[in-house]
A protein has these predicted regions:
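Conserved lysine of the Walker
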Residues: 21
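Phosphate-binding P-loop
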Residues: 1-7, 63-64
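Conserved substrate/cofactor phosphate-moiety recognition/catalytic segment
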Residues: 24-70
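Residue-level recognition of beta-strand->loop/alpha-helix junctions
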Residues: 37, 74, 99-101
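The conserved Walker
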Residues: 16-17
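NTP-dependent small-molecule kinase module
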Residues: 141-201
Length: 201
């Protein structure tokens, strides 16, 4: 009989505005896991952005206190949600991160404009650039706090996984825009093994 208790788990979909996090969330979010999302709260309760963000934050804190599984999306351009993940780690949570970025914030600006044209929510251009820069700087801390971390470059039509952390082993895969040195600078990891992370034929 197995008496090992499963750790509570957080799945976080992170990355700058316009990188394509929501698409990853739709595909990879476990249907049985509660999803805490400010945009959905805003839509369901018809409240403003600030109230939705505050409600989402309170909900995450409640789940954390109760040691319940949950997943959420975040730009992770400030330390607020990073601090939440650190506290979760200290409480014994298993943290799985899917980090989605692009090679150039201009791509993010274009995608947000396309999203707005289709009826989606807007983010001011200057905020996209500022958050992109702040988010990229925090990537090493995201990698450090995660038990499993996948980083995808989503600049092209097909996402390309450039990095994977699992059980304190680190793997990378190169493409035109991302070579080992650049991936090392992004993640803060120098001791990485090259591996086909994209199942190319």
């Amino acid at each position: 009989m197995n008496n090992v208790q499963k750790k509570p788990e957080i799945i976080v979909f992170a990355g700058p505005n316009g990188s394509g996090k929501s698409t990853f969330t739709e595909i990879l979010r476990p249907p049985q896991m509660d999803y805490i999302n400010a945009d959905e709260i805003k839509k369901n309760l018809k409240c403003d952005d600030l109230e939705a963000a505050q409600l989402a934050e309170r909900q995450r804190e409640t789940y954390l206190s109760d040691k319940r599984d949950f997943c959420f999306e975040t730009v992770l351009s400030t330390s607020r949600n990073l601090d939440l993940l650190k506290r979760a780690q200290e409480m014994g949570y298993f943290i799985r991160c899917y980090y989605v970025l692009t090679i150039d914030p201009m791509i993010n600006v274009y995608r947000v404009k396309a999203r707005v044209a289709s009826g989606g929510h807007d983010v001011p251009e200057e905020k996209i650039y500022a958050r992109y820069d702040r988010a990229i700087v925090l990537v090493p801390k995201v990698v450090a706090v995660s038990d499993i971390c996948h980083i995808y470059d989503n600049s092209e039509e097909e996402p390309f996984r450039i990095f994977k952390k699992r059980k304190n082993l680190y793997f990378y895969d190169e493409c035109v825009d991302w070579q080992r040195a650049k991936i090392g600078t992004l993640t803060g990891i120098s001791d990485m093994e090259r591996k086909d992370l994209n199942h190319r034929v």
